[in-house]
Amino acid sequence: MRFIRMTMLSVVIATAVGAPSLAGVAHAQGAKATINDPVGPPPDPTHIPTVLPEDIKWTGQEGRQQQARLFGDSSKPGLYGVVIKWYPGNFSQPHFHDQERYAYVISGTWWVSTSNVYDEKTTYPVHAGTVAIDKANTVHWDGARQGEKEPAVLVLVGMGPVKTTQVDENGKPKATPPAR
């Protein structure tokens, strides 16, 4: 389990920190070009597949919280990655996950709390560029405070399947309503 955690943390850190460094090394070895030079040909999609922003499939409710799957599936075994967008004034309720998850804040400010009690004044700002570990089986909740100028956008990576459990004010799992 420790190996998996360290591997996943390495993936998040390498993505956040290492990729820009490698890009600088690659650029230093190639011919110099500026943004005023003509662009090169599009990359071969069998080498570097890309998805344009307008083609990203978002789920959820715009203006509240949205998610876009990057790879994998959090409900199935294996590595998964999602982008989460928290709009200002929206939060989850206190809960925990049965698997560790790793977050990198891309933009905005992500507000988090480890309190069992929902009180937005207990949230703490996690700013763009920060890496956070969502420890398994520990209560937290998150979102974006009212008054933020932009949504909090983060990449979340974990191992599936992951189960999310809502908790009461004592940190105990809430009863799951019976299936209809």
Question: For each of these PLM feature ranges, what is it?
Answer:
Residues 1-6:
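Positively charged n-region of N-terminal signal peptides that target proteins for export
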Residues 15-25:
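C-terminal segment of classical bacterial N-terminal signal peptides
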Residues 29-80, 169-180:
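A short, N-terminal "cap"/entry segment at the start of jelly-roll beta-barrel domains
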Residues 47-49, 133, 141-180:
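Double-stranded beta-helix
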Residues 80-97, 135-137:
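Conserved short histidine dyad/triad with adjacent acidic residue
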Residues 87-90, 97-117:
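Glycine- and acidic-residue-biased ligand/ion/polar-headgroup-sensing regions
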Residues 92-94, 112-113, 134, 139-147:
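Short beta-strand His + acidic residue motifs that chelate non-heme Fe in jelly-roll/DSBH
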Residues 116-138:
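Short acidic-glycine-tyrosine-enriched beta hairpin
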